[in-house]
Amino acid sequence: MPQIVDAVKLPVVAAGGIADARGMVAAFALGASGVQMGTVFLSCEESGASPNHRKALLTREAGTTALTRGFTGRLARGIKNQLLDELNKKETEILPYPLQRALVRHLSIPAEKAERRDLLPLWAGQSARLSRCEDVSVLLSNLVAQVSEIAGSVQRWSAIRSSQPQPETR
């Protein structure tokens, strides 16, 4: 990311794998002007994700994700389950977007009603295990407070470090 920040005059927004304040601070330290967080918001009731999808994000299985074109015909990441595995076995038979999306959506309706999470397209990023069930306003408030806390720790460390004698360089 530092190379991109140095090479462009536009704001750089970090995305992918950022699900908590530590990831946000790391992105800012590397020069990002902002961050885009996705999966961490899916477990919030306000997300519009189905109850089964939100529950799946809070399980151990959420830590095992894989890439697939099977959900929509376009590359996406999801929680590994029977549906994802079966679709990936038939990768050469996957329809182009939006046909594949329509097909999977049609199959998802009865799976959702039957609470068959193993047959649902469970979109999730690599940091899905960091998801927690919170109201979105609580999640945002916590993120702001935690970023401030981490930033304060970094500033204190920097002040301590700069007050120590530095070795001579030749």
Model-derived features: where do they sit?
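Conserved active-site-proximal phosphate/metal-binding subdomains
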Residues: 1-13, 18-170
